[in-house]
């Protein structure tokens, strides 16, 4: 059943305003005659005004779906009986107006509430368009989300790759550092071996006349080369007698400079002007040895680094083979040969040669005196770093015996720099203790720095390098003045094995000059011994009038020879 509410407005001829309110309840009341609806009417007659049309204000009703014939009763709630007639008229009016009202209201309200077909189609199109837009927006959001997720995955993968590359690069850097350390260690070992092997070509060594060569079973073993310090002029190596001992003793002996001017205790002093020459059999594959029962000393010459096809090695091997076939008393023949050689030489040449050799031995003697005077030198007290490095250097040498001293110093310096002050404090305390102890022992000690070394040669002050270059040039000039052909007139002593000095000298004359070779590292003091004789009797060998002195010794005479190193 539909609920309807409306307003009825009528304009009666009497120009009276009437208001009818009709209420039709939802639930019908049942009476004797059947279904009926309750209708309530309120009638009101207000004061009439001229010019204002009367009208119905409001009417509430419920229209049943049946016809108006089904309406049974009209119950009016009025106080008076006079109103019953009016209610009947009103009910008739309502019954007459109900179909028109229903028709009017049904059309308007249905159109408003339900809408027409055109409006529904338009709304459907709008809804479809909105659904399409929402679908597109959803697809865009999904694609953007997937792209964002893919980008995040790609960025994460790139970060992982970069981290992996960085880790690999770090590992490669660590490996390269380790390889560099190993290569540096190998380079140090090779440098040491090169320093041992890289020695100048040597002449035949000069031995004292009372010393004889004995058979040494150790000479067939490979000979260890001796480390050298660099010099600017070539010299022949003297005999170096070493005792076989522990490895540490060998290191200490090779690290110290050799005293070449000291004479052996079991040999007899002899004239310096005419030294006697002996051959030391050393080759690349081993050499022969010479026997003698008069002296127990053993001769080892470090010539193992020379090649097999070297002219020096061939000459020395040939001389050794010739000397090996001599009789048991070679001293007699050699003394006789030396005497005859001195007799045949002019007196001036002998004196010049003796003076040249005396000059060179005097230089070595000065060095000996200087080295000997160093024993009275007062050393400075050790500082904290030296105290700490003393034990650390020993530990590194025990772990790496072949490591170079420069590498050890670099390692110690970096370690000391990385130490904290608290770790260095005990060593500073030890430094203070050593300083106090040194002050107690030497109260008058004053540190004097080493003076600059200068040489005065023929009234000119020269540096040490200039002095060495000058001496080298003089030795070259002296060597060029010798004539080998003048030795052919000398008388050689007879030899039962057919040994002749001429063949030996011919072999020596073919040897390459050692003046063009500058050794890199030589720690051995050497003496140049000349076999050849000057052709010119006078002026071939100049007298040495060189003075090597310190800055405060410049007033000494030209004939005095002084070398000061400290």
From Swiss-Prot:
Q: List the Pfam families.
A: HMG_box
Taxonomy, superkingdom: Eukaryota
Location comes to: Nucleus
Record's Gene3D superfamilies? High mobility group box domain (1.10.30.10)
Which InterPro entries would you find in this protein's record? Answer: HMG_box_dom (IPR009071), HMG_box_dom_sf (IPR036910), SOX/SOX-like_TF (IPR051356)
* Signal peptide (from-to): none
Any one GO MF term held by the record is: sequence-specific DNA binding
One annotated Gene Ontology cellular component of this protein:
nucleus
Which stretches are labeled DNA-binding? 378-446
This protein's UniProt keywords = DNA-binding, Nucleus, Transcription, Transcription regulation
Where do the record's region annotations for Disordered lie?
47-69, 242-301, 545-566
**Biased segments, Polar residues type:** 254-274
What the entry lists under SMART domains is as follows:
HMG (SM00398)
Give the protein's function: Transcription factor that binds to DNA at the consensus sequence 5'-AACAAT-3'.
- What do we know about how this protein assembles, alone or with others? Homodimer.
| Database matches in PANTHER family | FI18025P1 (PTHR45789), TRANSCRIPTION FACTOR SOX-13 (PTHR45789:SF4)
- Protein's name according to its UniProt entry: Transcription factor Sox-13
Q: What is the species listed in this Swiss-Prot or TrEMBL entry?
A: Xenopus tropicalis
**Lineage per the UniProt record:** Eukaryota, Metazoa, Chordata, Craniata, Vertebrata
